[in-house]
Amino acid sequence: MNRHLARRPLAGLLAGLVLLLLAATAVASSNSITLNLKGGYRNQQRTACSARHHYTLYHGGGTLKMDGYVSPAPALPDGTWRVKIKIKQCKGGRFVAIWQRHARGNGVLLNGVKIGHFRISYRMRRKGYFFARAYYYGYQPRIRSQDQHFRVTG
């Protein structure tokens, strides 16, 4: 048997696997979630827990309002799907979870496309450096927003 002929099916199989992997990655990356922090009185670059980030500053005792979007909108009735919001604080040189809640979501039209929207509030009782993150577990793999860093001052 000719070795070149035996390698062709293997090369074709490898090329097919690469295309399948790229397609799966593209499908997974088409799902997204965003988280937006509302308000704040100033922005600054700071280092907390050994990492430098952009922080939005808020006064302690106030309420941090957040909202975000899940795209595409979950194929569930409005109010039945939920997004988990987690807040972590810099303590002892690392970020630790201090608060988490679930926000109900509903579909909205944005530029003629249905996407999912959610909103939630957090009472800022502690001073320090924090970040908030949103998760949606209805898609596999689950999707996670970028970290939104903020600082609560006195």
Please annotate each region the language model reported.
Residues N2-L14:
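Bacterial N-terminal signal peptides that target proteins for export
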Residues G12-A23:
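Bacterial N-terminal signal peptides
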Residues A28-T63, Y69-S71:
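Short, compositionally biased P/S/T/A/G/V-rich stretches that sit at domain boundaries
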Residues V96-V113:
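Solvent-exposed serine/threonine-rich low-complexity stretches and specific carbohydrate-binding patches
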Residues L110-R123:
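Exposed aromatic-hydrophobic patches
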Residues M124-Q146, V152:
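Enriched for extracellular/lumenal, surface-exposed ectodomains of secreted and cell-surface proteins
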